Amino acid sequence: MARLVGVDLPRDKRLEVALTYIYGVGRTRAADTLKATGISPDLRVKDLGDAEIVALRDHLEGNYKIEGDLRREVAADIRRKVEIGSYEGLRHRRGLPVRGQRTKTNARTRKGPKRTVAGKKKAGRK
């Protein structure tokens, strides 16, 4: 496995796909990086030379916020919204969806497993 900015890239994948294992690098950014460094996207990670790895690392670290820096920035943005008391911060604090999704049904990923509420009974048929 080639190690790039603290991430082990899978050896047998194409470079364009393997770069997406880095937090903050998707398919578009991976393609742009390969075009800027002049490396073929069809190349496998195991076929990379040391010079190409250095070129990729320099380009990624020099032009983009990735991995730890990006994670810290996102966490700081959320913390700031919570501290200033914005609506988004309130939703983060309560563990609810932030971007306006419905919560009457769904939203289970954010809310967690269902909690049964005592006292609710179904109306009986007469």
Swiss-Prot record:
Gene Ontology molecular function: rRNA binding; structural constituent of ribosome; tRNA binding
GO BP terms, alphabetized: translation
Superkingdom to which the source organism belongs: Bacteria
Pfam family name, one: Ribosomal_S13
Residue span of region Disordered: 93-126
Alphabetized UniProt keyword annotations: Ribonucleoprotein, Ribosomal protein, RNA-binding, rRNA-binding, tRNA-binding
GO CC annotations, alphabetized: cytosol; small ribosomal subunit
Keyword tRNA processing: no
PROSITE patterns in alphabetical order: RIBOSOMAL_S13_1, RIBOSOMAL_S13_2
Quaternary context: Part of the 30S ribosomal subunit. Forms a loose heterodimer with protein S19. Forms two bridges to the 50S subunit in the 70S ribosome.
NCBIfam families, sorted: uS13_bact (TIGR03631)
Family the entry assigns: Belongs to the universal ribosomal protein uS13 family.
HAMAP family (UniProt xref): Ribosomal_uS13
Primary role: Located at the top of the head of the 30S subunit, it contacts several helices of the 16S rRNA. In the 70S ribosome it contacts the 23S rRNA (bridge B1a) and protein L5 of the 50S subunit (bridge B1b), connecting the 2 subunits; these bridges are implicated in subunit movement. Contacts the tRNAs in the A and P-sites.
Name the UniProt record assigns to this protein: Small ribosomal subunit protein uS13
Native source organism of the sequence: Beutenbergia cavernae (strain ATCC BAA-8 / DSM 12333 / CCUG 43141 / JCM 11478 / NBRC 16432 / NCIMB 13614 / HKI 0122)
Lineage: Bacteria, Bacillati, Actinomycetota, Actinomycetes, Micrococcales
